[in-house]
């Protein structure tokens, strides 16, 4: 009989919930980084700069929103399959979500950091010059504050989801426990779910 490491499952669920929350708040923080009037020092009229003026920030909003929904599905599947037989479609779905969700979060956070790691610059097309959004006005500082918070939250969500996936994989492959020689393979597989391509040591 394989003795399951029972703590792995609830801990992975906690990190999934944390990832969902961080991703959702990240999207909300970026969405509120809007309608902040920034005054340029080049004699041009005031310009309202929003997150939608930067493709990387738009991608972050879309990616974190999608990741939130997908991770919610993963949380449901991970929670509902406890105590039930593990069907192949569930495992395949979990593996797919485990690859897609971190990819969305890491790429969106990386793209946002590439644009606004230290400062955020906006290009004034009519005069062909750019200015610092963060330093141009108090409103610009507020805009950048929201953007930076959103970036770090997206990165935190990516780390949380990755750790949840690590615990899930570890539980499938190693955390099912050790198998005793007195039990049959069929009993160990059916009772503790030592499957999914992983083998229990006898």
From Swiss-Prot:
<dbReference type="InterPro" id="IPR006702">
    <property type="entry name" value="CASP_dom"/>
</dbReference>
<dbReference type="GO" id="GO:0005886">
    <property type="term" value="C:plasma membrane"/>
</dbReference>
<protein>
    <recommendedName>
        <fullName>CASP-like protein 1U4</fullName>
    </recommendedName>
</protein>
<dbReference type="InterPro" id="IPR044173">
    <property type="entry name" value="CASPL"/>
</dbReference>
<comment type="similarity">
    <text>Belongs to the Casparian strip membrane proteins (CASP) family.</text>
</comment>
<dbReference type="InterPro" id="IPR006459">
    <property type="entry name" value="CASP/CASPL"/>
</dbReference>
<feature type="topological domain" description="Cytoplasmic">
    <location>
        <begin position="78"/>
        <end position="94"/>
    </location>
</feature>
<feature type="topological domain" description="Cytoplasmic">
    <location>
        <begin position="168"/>
        <end position="202"/>
    </location>
</feature>
<feature type="transmembrane region" description="Helical">
    <location>
        <begin position="95"/>
        <end position="115"/>
    </location>
</feature>
<comment type="subunit">
    <text>Homodimer and heterodimers.</text>
</comment>
<feature type="transmembrane region" description="Helical">
    <location>
        <begin position="11"/>
        <end position="31"/>
    </location>
</feature>
<feature type="topological domain" description="Extracellular">
    <location>
        <begin position="32"/>
        <end position="56"/>
    </location>
</feature>
<feature type="topological domain" description="Cytoplasmic">
    <location>
        <begin position="1"/>
        <end position="10"/>
    </location>
</feature>
<feature type="transmembrane region" description="Helical">
    <location>
        <begin position="147"/>
        <end position="167"/>
    </location>
</feature>
<keyword id="KW-0472">Membrane</keyword>
<keyword id="KW-1003">Cell membrane</keyword>
<keyword id="KW-1133">Transmembrane helix</keyword>
<feature type="transmembrane region" description="Helical">
    <location>
        <begin position="57"/>
        <end position="77"/>
    </location>
</feature>
<dbReference type="Pfam" id="PF04535">
    <property type="entry name" value="CASP_dom"/>
</dbReference>
<feature type="topological domain" description="Extracellular">
    <location>
        <begin position="116"/>
        <end position="146"/>
    </location>
</feature>
<keyword id="KW-0812">Transmembrane</keyword>
């Amino acid at each position: 009989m394989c003795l399951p490491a029972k703590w792995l499952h609830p801990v992975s669920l906690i990190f999934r919930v944390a990832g969902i929350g961080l991703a959702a708040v990240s999207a909300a923080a970026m969405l509120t980084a809007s309608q902040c009037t920034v005054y340029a020092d080049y004699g041009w009229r005031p310009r309202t700069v929003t997150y939608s003026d930067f493709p990387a920030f738009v991608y972050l909003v879309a990616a974190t929103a999608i990741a939130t929904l997908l991770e919610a599905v993963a949380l449901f599947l991970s929670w509902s399959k406890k105590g039930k037989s593990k069907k192949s479609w569930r495992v395949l779905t979990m593996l797919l979500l485990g690859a897609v969700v971190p990819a969305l979060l890491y790429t969106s956070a990386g793209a946002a950091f590439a644009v606004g790691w230290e400062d955020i610059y906006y290009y004034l097309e009519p005069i062909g010059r750019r200015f610092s959004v963060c330093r141009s006005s108090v409103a610009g500082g507020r805009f950048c504050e929201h953007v930076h918070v959103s970036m770090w939250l997206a990165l935190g969500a990516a780390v949380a989801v990755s750790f949840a996936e690590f615990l899930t994989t570890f539980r499938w492959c190693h955390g099912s426990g050790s198998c005793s020689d007195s039990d049959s393979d069929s009993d160990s597989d059916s009772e503790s779910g030592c499957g999914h391509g992983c083998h229990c040591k006898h």
